[in-house]
Amino acid sequence: MKTKEVVDDITMNRAITRITYEIIERNKELNQVVLAGIKTRGVHLAHRIQKRLAQLEQIDIPVAEIDTKPFRDDKKSQEADSTLIPVDITDRQVILIDDVLYTGRTIRAAIDNLVSHGRPSRVSLAVLVDRGHRELPIRTDYIGKNIPTSRTEEIIVEMTETDGQDRILIKGE
């Protein structure tokens, strides 16, 4: 299988910055926003967006860590839920953040987990990469890159926090 870099570190960081600016533009009350990163790389993205928001708007937005494994309908897991939500999300605007949007099943599981902890006033979705091929009616509100793929290809997001570098790869035939 071939692996090809399609987004380098500079372009990836620009996409994250663009998402941050869109969050600022679309959310009049940033103090009501909670960033909810989907483990693992979504949490890293949420922290990066949180840092940029602090630099641009001088506001400290809380970051939640959402574990989808106990809520998946396609992969059964016996692992305990390791979700960490540091604030009450009831009546808050929660932005779910993940690295790749594909079938939508991870996002559905994240929403199920989220609403088991409270009732947000609104839930929106930010992803670094939208690769298409939805199986559920889920759409993104904030998007870094649209990277169309075939079902046999795979998008790999590498981040400094876990992989030592920032880049996006396509793995396929």
From Swiss-Prot:
GO molecular-function terms, A-Z: RNA binding; uracil phosphoribosyltransferase activity
InterPro entries: PRibTrfase_dom (IPR000836), PRTase-like (IPR029057), PyrR (IPR023050), PyrR_bifunctional (IPR050137)
Keywords: Glycosyltransferase, RNA-binding, Transcription, Transcription regulation, Transcription termination, Transferase
EC number of this enzyme: 2.4.2.9
Catalytic activity: UMP + diphosphate = 5-phospho-alpha-D-ribose 1-diphosphate + uracil
Positions occupied by motif PRPP-binding: 94-106
GO biological process: DNA-templated transcription termination
Pfam families linked: Pribosyltran
Function: Regulates transcriptional attenuation of the pyrimidine nucleotide (pyr) operon by binding in a uridine-dependent manner to specific sites on pyr mRNA. This disrupts an antiterminator hairpin in the RNA and favors formation of a downstream transcription terminator, leading to a reduced expression of downstream genes. Also displays a weak uracil phosphoribosyltransferase activity which is not physiologically significant.
The family this protein is said to belong to: Belongs to the purine/pyrimidine phosphoribosyltransferase family. PyrR subfamily.
Assembly with partners or alone: Homodimer and homohexamer; in equilibrium.
NCBIfam families, per the entry: PRK05205.1-4, PRK05205.1-5
Name of the protein this chain belongs to: Bifunctional protein PyrR
Gene source species: Streptococcus gordonii (strain Challis / ATCC 35105 / BCRC 15272 / CH1 / DL1 / V288)
Encoding gene, per UniProt annotation: pyrR
